[in-house]
């Protein structure tokens, strides 16, 4: 069922008055760095791993409200959702979903320890108050430990970009009775960075179930804080914090719940991370303490089910810079995770050798050992190469293995099996990038396999749950990513991304993973004060999950999105955004609705 809503009354919205191409990809230049590919910050051209970088300006001007939907403009990234904003949404990297993709916000691991798969739910996360995003692809357990089998998504909150005190305020309103307000404040001195953001989002939504009639609304408040102070020339300290309080209505499979349609999740999540950095000659050190807690209550037809998860972590990271052709990174960490029934702990140690034998060649070798309280030790490794064959041509290659330990829920005999062993993975990619004047072209081949994969089988009767059990099997994904950016002229920029993914689970097509995924974006600077972005997404050949009803709309679809910005003054920008311009009727998860045409307008004021 398709839901169409017209643009509501004008308010205020986020959008800088410069052209932001809809398919977001950092323009290639020597100053661009990745902070997650290696343990130390690395120039993007010197990284052998495949990384997508989305600048803060493009995140803040995202043409989609849900951040997970916006990320699908990147090659290799897809998503599915069980309804409107606030309902469960999974982001996949090269066919692997949330359970295999740790999500970090300001260094805090925000994956839910109490969720059945252990992943992060993108359902209620918008771009409000967020900044730069990095997506690291392939098995990365040698860098990030367990679960980093498909890759890692690293999100930064608001950051100061200039000295002094600055801020912005924005509100946005539109279809589906959507309302959002955002406040951001930043301060920078010679030694201190400080940023705070707060957002409030409310929407009436639409029926999550394709067979339902009542709207499923969503409301959330989110706050982020970042602080760093350079105490002396060799010592720095800081902290980051986040708080999320949300209420999201949802539908079970098959339709609305029993009257009064009271199916909803109430979630409160808090995160805190403190760190100290010390430089002692050629060796740098960082010690960090972090805590994340998710307290969720799922109410379905009058029955409340609590889910509470906590994660506590201590990190030490060190780096020895010889000043020559090689440097050595090393570290250790201790993590505790618990839900209402169980508790585990993990001790990890790692080392990473970076070698630059010539000015055009960079090699990275990483090894990590994780000692899990429920299993034997797991050793992970990674090797990566970046070769600048010519000044305008870069060849990248990487091979890595990884592991994912069963979650607390999967070890629970009611749903799973306490004898489950960790999943193991192998992945590699090979890519080439051609620099252009004001753009680039990139092609990457990739492959990932997982042995002993744990998945949920709704037809299994092995456990006492009565509605399915976790089982084990195998997974393979192979494919090709193509992407590029071309500056047509001084006023027009074209972005494109195409991904072919052939993913199999236990010898059958993996569900909800498109075989073909295309995104095209055109950014236009129409006048000095007016810019617009036009985006087209086409998805083809998708297999619905076994839970989808016989009548579903999972398959091929094409979406058009438009957003435009008008700079009223140097400090005030008016904004218009239209999602699904031609009102496509489609589903990304069988039996669950997606939005029809939806329009939003607003204004953003900087000070």
PLM features: residue spans?
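N-terminal Sec signal peptide and the immediately downstream disordered periplasmic leader
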Residues: 1-74, 186-187, 233, 486
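Conserved C-terminal beta-signal and adjacent last beta-strands/turns
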Residues: 5-7, 186, 230, 511-607
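Extracytoplasmic beta-strand/coil segments of soluble accessory domains associated
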Residues: 36, 68, 72-109
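N-terminal periplasmic accessory domains that precede
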Residues: 67-70, 89-92, 101-104, 120-125, ...
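Short acidic/polar hinge/loop motifs at secondary-structure boundaries
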Residues: 109-137
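Periplasmic-side early beta-strands and strand-to-turn transitions of outer-membrane beta-barrels
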Residues: 141-142, 154-156, 160-164, 168-172, ...
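Outer-membrane beta-barrel signature, preferentially recognizing the C-terminal barrel domain
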Residues: 256-275, 279, 307-310, 342, ...
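Gram-negative outer-membrane beta-barrel transporters
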Residues: 356-360, 447, 470-545, 573, ...
């Amino acid at each position: 069922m398709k839901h169409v809503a017209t643009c509501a009354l004008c308010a205020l919205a986020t959008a800088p008055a410069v052209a932001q191409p809809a398919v977001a990809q950092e323009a290639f230049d020597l100053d661009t760095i990745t902070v997650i590919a290696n343990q130390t910050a690395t120039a993007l051209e010197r990284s052998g791993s495949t990384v997508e970088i989305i600048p803060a300006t493009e995140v803040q001007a995202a043409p989609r409200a849900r951040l997970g939907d916006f990320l699908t403009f990147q090659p290799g990234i897809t998503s599915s959702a069980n309804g409107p904003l606030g309902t469960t949404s999974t982001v996949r990297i090269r066919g692997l979903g949330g359970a295999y993709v740790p999500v970090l916000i300001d260094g805090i691991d925000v994956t839910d320890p109490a969720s059945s798969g252990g992943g992060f739910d993108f359902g209620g996360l918008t771009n409000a108050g967020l900044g730069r995003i990095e997506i690291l692809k392939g098995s990365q357990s040698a860098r990030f430990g367990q679960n980093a089998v498909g890759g890692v998504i690293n999100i930064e909150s608001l950051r100061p970009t200039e000295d002094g005190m600055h801020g912005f305020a924005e509100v946005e309103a539109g279809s589906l009775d959507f309302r959002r307000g955002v406040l951001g404040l930043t301060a920078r001195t010679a030694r201190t960075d400080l940023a705070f953001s707060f957002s409030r989002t409310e929407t009436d939504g639409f029926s999550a179930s394709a067979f339902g009639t009542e709207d499923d609304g969503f409301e959330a408040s989110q706050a982020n804080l970042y602080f760093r102070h350079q105490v002396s020339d060799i010592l720095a300290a800081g902290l980051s914090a986040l708080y999320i309080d949300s209420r999201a209505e949802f539908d079970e499979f098959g339709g609305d719940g029993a009257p009064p349609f009271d199916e909803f999740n109430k979630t409160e999540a808090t995160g805190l991370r403190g760190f100290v950095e010390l430089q002692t000659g050629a060796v740098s050190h960082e010690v960090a303490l972090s805590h994340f807690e998710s307290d969720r209550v799922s109410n379905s037809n009058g029955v409340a089910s609590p889910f509470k998860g906590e994660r506590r972590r201590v990190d030490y990271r060190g780096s020895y810079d010889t000043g020559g052709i090689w440097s050595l990174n090393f570290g250790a960490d201790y993590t505790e995770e618990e839900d209402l029934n169980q508790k585990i702990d993990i001790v990890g140690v790692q080392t990473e050798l970076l070698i630059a034998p010539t000015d055009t060649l960079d090699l990275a070798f990483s090894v990590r050992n994780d000692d899990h309280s429920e299993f034997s030790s797991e050793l992970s490794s990674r090797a990566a190469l970046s070769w600048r064959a010519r000044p305008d041509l870069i060849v990248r290659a990487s091979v890595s293995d990884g592991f994912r330990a069963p979650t607390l829920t999967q070890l629970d005999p009611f749903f799973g099996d306490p004898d489950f062993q960790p999943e193991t993975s192998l992945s590699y990619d090979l890519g080439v990038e051609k620099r252009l004047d004001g753009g680039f072209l990139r092609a990457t081949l990739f492959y990932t396999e997982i042995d002993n994969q744990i998945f949920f089988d709704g037809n299994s009767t092995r456990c006492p749950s009565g509605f399915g059990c976790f089982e084990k099997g195998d997974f393979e994904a192979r494919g090709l990513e193509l992407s590029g950016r071309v500056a047509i002229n001084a006023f027009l920029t074209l972005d494109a991304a195409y991904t072919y993914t052939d993913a199999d689970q236990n010898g059958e097509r993996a569900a909800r993973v498109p075989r073909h995924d295309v995104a095209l974006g055109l950014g236009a600077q129409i006048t000095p004060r007016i810019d617009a972005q036009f985006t087209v997404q086409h998805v083809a050949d998708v297999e619905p999950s076994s839970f989808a009803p016989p009548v579903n709309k999972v398959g091929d679809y094409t979406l058009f999105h438009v957003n435009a910005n008008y700079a009223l003054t140097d400090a005030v920008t008016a904004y218009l955004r239209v999602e699904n311009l031609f009102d496509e009727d489609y589903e990304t998860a069988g039996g669950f609705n997606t939005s029809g045409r939806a329009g939003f307008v607003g204004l953003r004021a900087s000070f």
